[in-house]
């Protein structure tokens, strides 16, 4: 059975029969995990093993594990600071900031891969304009050069740990105040303004080989009246053709308020897939998941399957014990653990 175009969540810390029924459906290609799915490192590894055992090829398993306030697994995992902290260091010590960002990426990937997670939806490539609370300290900086350097470093660290990177939220979510989880944000800038600022960070990371991108549930009415994640203009004409992106396009969560302008859950999924998404996410609404699985008609294209296959995690440590026996890894954990503390404590070794 090939991977399908839908990524769903599961209810709790172990699979229920309803979970298994859903993720066995041929339209499903992945599972996204949340904090409610985590009790302990051992339980998490058992859960991912059970998810991977349901299908061949195994389903993709993903998580939002950016650091700061968006880190789903905490006990037994290294606390990763918000990305803004690396930006603060970059202002004074760019080389050290790049080194620390790369180490943070390595830690994120290695720890998640040791627990059977294929990838995290990270890094955030949005610019920090100081207005968006939902982005806020999740962004590296307000300066494009800082974002480019730090995001590239984080991506290199993820790669070292066996994990692909997912840049978000194309073409930029940082300029709008509204939170697309609960509202429909509108960015009134014209295309040239966006292309010369926010979009440049995506262009650079695409040139650097980023493997996946997630578009924003933001409407840019001077470009298209649909949110970017449902816009063929943004995804095909700009992202694919103009920027030359050949990786995976993941929709943001179809249950978010910012997706509501498109219609019901099936209409949302169809709109995203037709616009150019390879895989759509639907989270926290099992009844809507059942509705989508019952009603969506979609034959996934060979090109999408090839892209998605590259999101499976690479080589990884057999366990956290093995990681903790690696002195280089533990030194990285110590250095990243100092980020965000008083300047005098920064690990400038």
Swiss-Prot record:
Its EC number is 3.2.1.52. The record marks 179 as: Important for catalytic activity. The keyword Hydrolase applies. The active site is at residues 181, 252. Its main location: cytoplasm. It comes from the Bacteria. Substrate binds at residues 64, 72, 138, 168-169. It catalyses: Hydrolysis of terminal non-reducing N-acetyl-D-hexosamine residues in N-acetyl-beta-D-hexosaminides. One of its GO terms (cellular component) is cytoplasm. It is an enzyme of class 3 (hydrolase). PROSITE patterns: GLYCOSYL_HYDROL_F3. GO terms for molecular function: beta-N-acetylhexosaminidase activity. It is found in: Cytoplasm. Keywords: Cell cycle, Cell division, Cell shape, Cell wall biogenesis/degradation, Cytoplasm, Glycosidase, Hydrolase, Peptidoglycan synthesis. InterPro entries: Beta_hexosaminidase_bac, Glyco_hydro_3_AS, Glyco_hydro_3_N, Glyco_hydro_3_N_sf, Glycoside_hydrolase_SF, NagZ_Beta-hexosaminidase. Pathway: Cell wall biogenesis; peptidoglycan recycling. GO terms for biological process: carbohydrate metabolic process; cell division; cell wall organization; peptidoglycan biosynthetic process; peptidoglycan turnover; regulation of cell shape. NCBIfam families: PRK05337.1. Plays a role in peptidoglycan recycling by cleaving the terminal beta-1,4-linked N-acetylglucosamine (GlcNAc) from peptide-linked peptidoglycan fragments, giving rise to free GlcNAc, anhydro-N-acetylmuramic acid and anhydro-N-acetylmuramic acid-linked peptides. Belongs to the glycosyl hydrolase 3 family. NagZ subfamily. This is Beta-hexosaminidase. It comes from Methylobacillus flagellatus (strain ATCC 51484 / DSM 6875 / VKM B-1610 / KT). The lineage of its organism: Bacteria, Pseudomonadati, Pseudomonadota, Betaproteobacteria, Nitrosomonadales.
């Amino acid at each position: 059975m090939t991977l399908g175009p839908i990524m769903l969540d599961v209810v709790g810390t172990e699979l229920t029969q309803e979970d298994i029924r859903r993720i066995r459906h041929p339209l499903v290609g992945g599972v996204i995990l949340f904090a409610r799915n985590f009790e302990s490192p051992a339980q998490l590894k058992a859960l991912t093993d059970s998810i991977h055992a349901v299908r061949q090829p195994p389903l993709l398993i993903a998580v939002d594990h950016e650091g700061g306030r968006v880190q789903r697994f905490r006990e037994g995992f290294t606390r990763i600071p918000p990305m803004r902290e690396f930006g603060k260091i970059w202002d004074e010590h760019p080389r050290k900031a790049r080194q620390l960002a790369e180490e943070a990426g390595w830690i994120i990937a290695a720890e998640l891969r040791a627990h059977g997670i294929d990838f995290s939806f990270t890094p955030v490539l949005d610019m920090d304009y100081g207005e968006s609370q939902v982005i806020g300290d999740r962004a590296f900086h307000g300066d494009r050069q800082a974002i480019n350097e730090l995001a590239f470093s984080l991506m290199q660290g993820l790669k070292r740990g066996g994990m692909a990177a997912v840049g978000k939220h194309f073409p930029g979510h940082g300029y709008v105040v509204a939170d697309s989880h609960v509202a429909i944000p509108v960015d009134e800038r014209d295309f040239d303004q966006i292309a010369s600022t926010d979009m440049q960070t995506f262009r650079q990371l695409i040139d650097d080989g980023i493997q996946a991108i997630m578009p924003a549930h933001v409407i840019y009415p001077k470009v298209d009246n649909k949110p970017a994640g449902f816009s063929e203009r943004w995804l095909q004409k700009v992202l694919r053709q103009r920027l030359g992106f050949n990786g995976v396009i993941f929709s943001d969560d179809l249950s978010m308020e910012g997706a509501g302008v498109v219609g019901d859950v099936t209409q949302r999924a169809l709109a995203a897939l037709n616009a150019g998404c390879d895989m759509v996410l639907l989270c926290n609404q099992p009844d809507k998941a059942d509705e989508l699985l019952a009603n969506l008609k979609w034959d996934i294209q060979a090109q999408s399957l090839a892209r998605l296959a590259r999101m499976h995690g690479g080589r990884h440590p057999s366990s956290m014990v093995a990681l903790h026996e690696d002195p280089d890894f533990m030194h990285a954990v110590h250095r990243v653990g100092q980020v965000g503390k008083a300047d005098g404590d920064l690990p400038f070794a």
